[in-house]
Design a protein with these regions (language model features):
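Juxtacatalytic substrate-recognition/specificity segment
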Residues: 21-143
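Beta/coil-rich, acidic/histidine-enriched accessory regions frequently appended to metallopeptidases
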Residues: 24-26, 51, 224-321, 328-331, ...
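Acidic/His/Gly-enriched intrinsically disordered linker/tail segments
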Residues: 85-89, 94, 102-109, 113, ...
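A flexible loop/linker signature enriched in serine peptidases of the S9 family
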Residues: 170, 286-289, 298-300, 312-323, ...
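Extracellular/periplasmic ectodomains of large secreted or surface enzymes and adhesion receptors
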Residues: 255-279, 285, 334, 352, ...
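Outer-membrane beta-barrel initiation region
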Residues: 259, 267-270, 490-590, 612, ...
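A short beta-strand motif characteristic of beta-propeller blades
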Residues: 267-268, 293-297, 329-337, 379-387, ...
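C-terminal outer-membrane beta-barrel translocator/porin domains of Gram-negative envelope proteins
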Residues: 588-603, 611-616, 623-745
Length: 745
């Protein structure tokens, strides 16, 4: 009797855990969550949201409810995240985009991300026919339009935003790359992000393609295609739907688009560069670091290289952090958020949405080895000027002065900090990429209509045909039709003009908003899932069918899953349910276990298990919004877990009474770069113990190989299927046990 009472008490205790520091407002089926100290941004978004929804509805993109919108303090990646399960969700990064990142020219980038998220929700919500019928039974997991190429849905949302605002569809650099060469083949855009123009080719060419499609065929045809795709039972198939709507396949439409923008194919070959360092020459992009490791990551534009070639660069792993690339190894620093490391140990961080420069303690090599949480008290923080929402690419000279680009309502200028802030430029153009030249500065600007390198007095130093950016060590990136070429901006330059700051560096304060009536955060508004997933396992020995669902609240601190599965071979109905609140959780499972070893040892048991666990150390290895993509949302990703377990079992067939046993377990999972390890110690009653360990090694560049080693041992009297180590078995095992399917039933 005590065990069920204890189980219920722990569940109640976990459900009353203190909620995150979030508040929310609810209007007409839209729940908007945000940090309680970010009401200014939230108020502006809630004011604009009805207008956005109305505009999209007029275009045929109705927004389904309920809808959860999150202004996410733990998201730095410069793009909106949109999901339809376990609830309809739009996740907006609280960090404003850096220069050349999506949305960087928008007066209010959070409003731009909100519009884009609403647009995608409108596209994903279009379904009819067989998907419409299945949607009534299984929920939002039936959403064919989720499977649309990014150059289509990004292009559609870009077109609608441009129509709504009455602006150009592309930002200045996207337009420059687009006009530098003819559009490449569709295969390059869809499948080869390592080839020029790179990963963001879907943005560079998708927006003009949809704009051309709208001009040639009209918006009604684009909407008709979305509606037809939303009723298709083979969502990957596009060409037949395109023929029915446009009279041509998707490839033929792209070919017509290419013909409409025919240009001379440029000679020579450039490089695919996101960022670089001039001395020694090192460059990087999304695919990897050169020279160095080929590893796909979303890297920032700015970095710092030590004389021995050690590179410091920022990467977006949900939140931004610094990485050290040195001699084939990659090490991440645990201080976050931080991005854009530059010379002089300076980088950028934020408190809420407001950016700060941060100067880390000296590591004697000019690097960022003190970018650790344990050294945070030794770092110096410098707040951005009032009204500035982003400070990308800081560089610090020998005198301690820091030059940086700054974004004010979508306008970018160069600022200098020398114990106080000075605004060096004040133009409606985009100024970025500052670099010290002695006592003076150079930077990139599109003041002339194209990006060129300019001196501090705005004197233009380059005459690039398409664009010049990122001055470093006398070099700059010159845009060509086939990539970036490294050239010299110092040719013929004797000296650079000195710094002269305009007298007025004030920024007009943005208009205030009406006070908001908010409610304290509750997880139950978003915890209940909006879908049921059909489940099927078929093998020569068994057929199993069932349904399952998983969910989480918008913070990821509350996780729930449940499911049932029927086995025709064993005539057994398995079921499981679990909940986790922050670091504490509980699970119940009912499942069969039936196998025969090579030694003709047989286990046939019907089991019930209860597990209570606590994770004093847990590192999220996947982002909150991608939690459902893991094998199990409650699985220990990395860290330490202590658990208390209780099991009852009886023979799977025939008569027999229930027996029970209890045990305590200690589990760990840890990764050190390419090496990972795990272990599980179980201490049973009646003086029985069981230990299993494993390591895995990942190696290779473009093709990754994995080597796994496992070992195990049991002490005391071994109990078959309980404390014994076993390799082999049916991959269907472990569905509800959450133990590895080939290790330890």
């Amino acid at each position: 009797m005590m065990r069920p009472v204890l189980f219920a008490a722990i569940i109640l205790l976990t459900l009353t855990t203190t909620a995150p520091a979030l508040v929310y407002v609810e209007k007409k089926g839209v729940l908007f969550y945000f940090p309680e100290n970010e009401t200014e941004i939230a108020a502006a978004l809630t004011e604009k949201m009805p207008e956005f929804i109305s505009f999209l509805a007029q275009k045929g993109l109705a927004i389904n409810h309920p809808l959860h919108v999150i202004l996410d303090d733990k998201l730095d990646e410069p793009q909106v995240k949109v999901h339809v399960i376990p609830h309809r969700e739009i996740r907006i990064p609280l960090r404003a985009p850096g220069v050349l990142e999506d949305g960087y020219t928008r007066e209010n980038p959070w409003a731009y991300f909100l519009f884009k998220g609403l647009c995608l929700q409108g596209i994903y919500g279009i379904r009819s026919g067989i998907p419409g019928v299945l949607h009534k039974g299984f929920g939002d997991i039936v959403s064919p339009n989720v499977i649309i190429p990014p150059w289509v849905d990004d292009g559609i949302c870009g077109l609608l935003y441009a129509k709504y605002r009455g602006i150009e569809i592309q930002d200045p650099l996207e337009a420059a790359v687009f006009h530098a060469s003819p559009p490449p083949d569709l295969d390059i855009i869809s499948h080869h992000p390592q080839i020029w123009p790179g990963y963001h080719g879907y943005r560079i060419y998708g927006k003009p393609f949809i704009h051309w499609l709208n001009r040639e065929y009209g918006w009604s045809k684009i909407l008709e295609f979305l509606q037809l795709h939303g009723r298709g039972i083979v969502p990957f198939e596009i060409d037949l739907k395109a023929i029915k709507v446009f009279g041509k396949t998707g490839a033929a439409l792209w070919s017509d688009f290419q013909k409409a923008y025919t240009r001379e194919i440029p000679a020579g070959q450039g490089l695919l560069i996101t960022g670089y360092w001039g001395e020694p020459f090192v460059y990087w992009n999304r695919a990897g670091v050169y020279p160095g490791k080929i590893q796909v990551r979303q890297r920032g534009r700015y970095g710092y290289v030590e004389p021995d070639g050690t590179l410091w660069v920022s990467q977006y792993d949900q939140m931004a952090r610094l990485y050290k690339y040195s001699k084939g190894t990659v090490v991440s620093m645990d201080f976050k958020p931080v991005w854009d490391p530059g010379p002089g140990r300076v980088a950028v961080t934020r408190l809420g949405h407001r950016p700060y420069l941060i100067i880390f303690a000296d590591d004697a090599r000019g690097g960022f080895r003190h970018a650790r949480r344990s050294d945070r008290d030794h770092a110096l923080l410098i707040a951005a000027p009032a009204g500035v929402i982003q400070l990308p690419g800081p560089v610090r000279d020998g005198q301690g002065r820091i030059a940086v680009a700054a974004n004010t309502a979508g306008n970018w200028d160069i600022w200098v900090y020398d114990d106080q802030w000075h605004r060096l430029t004040k133009t409606p153009s985009i100024e970025m990429d500052p670099w010290w030249e002695g006592d003076s500065l150079v930077y990139a600007s599109n003041l002339s209509g194209k990006f060129q390198i300019h001196a501090a007095d705005q004197n233009q130093l380059t005459q690039s045909a398409y664009g010049a950016i990122l001055p470093r060590h006398g070099k700059y990136l010159n845009l060509t039709g086939r990539g970036w070429k490294l050239q010299n901006y110092k040719l013929g330059q004797v000296a650079f003009a000195g710094l002269a700051y305009p007298m007025d560096a004030r920024i007009e304060a943005p208009a205030g908003h009406s006070p908001m009536e908010t409610k304290p955060y509750t997880p139950f508004k978003s915890l209940w899932p909006n879908y049921i997933r059909p489940d099927l396992f078929a093998a020569a020995t068994d057929l199993q069918i069932g349904i399952a669902t998983k969910s989480r609240d918008v913070t990821g601190n509350y996780i729930f899953d449940a499911g049932i599965r029927y086995s025709f071979d064993t005539n057994f109905l398995a079921l499981g349910a679990a909940i986790q609140v922050r670091r504490i959780g509980a699970r119940y499972t009912r499942y069969p276990l039936s196998y025969t070893t090579a030694l003709d040892q047989t286990v046939d048991e019907a089991r019930n298990e209860v597990k209570l666990f606590w994770r004093p150390i847990e590192e999220k290895t996947i982002s909150i919004e991608d939690l459902l993509r893991a094998a199990d949302g409650l699985e220990l990703g990395e860290g330490l877990e202590l658990s208390v377990n209780w099991r009852t079992w009886k023979p799977l067939e025939g008569e027999g009474s229930y027996r029970d046993e209890g045990w305590a377990a200690l589990s760990f999972v840890k990764h050190w770069g390419i090496l990972g390890g795990w272990g599980n110690l179980e201490i049973f009653t009646e003086n029985r113990q069981s230990l299993s360990l494993g390591i895995n090694l990942l190696f290779g560049d473009q093709i990754i190989s994995v080597m796994d080693l496992m070992a195990g041992r049991a002490w005391g009297e071994p109990t078959l299927g309980h404390t014994t180590f076993r390799i082999g078995g049916n991959i269907g095992e472990g569905y509800f046990t959450r133990n590895p399917s080939r290790l330890f039933p």
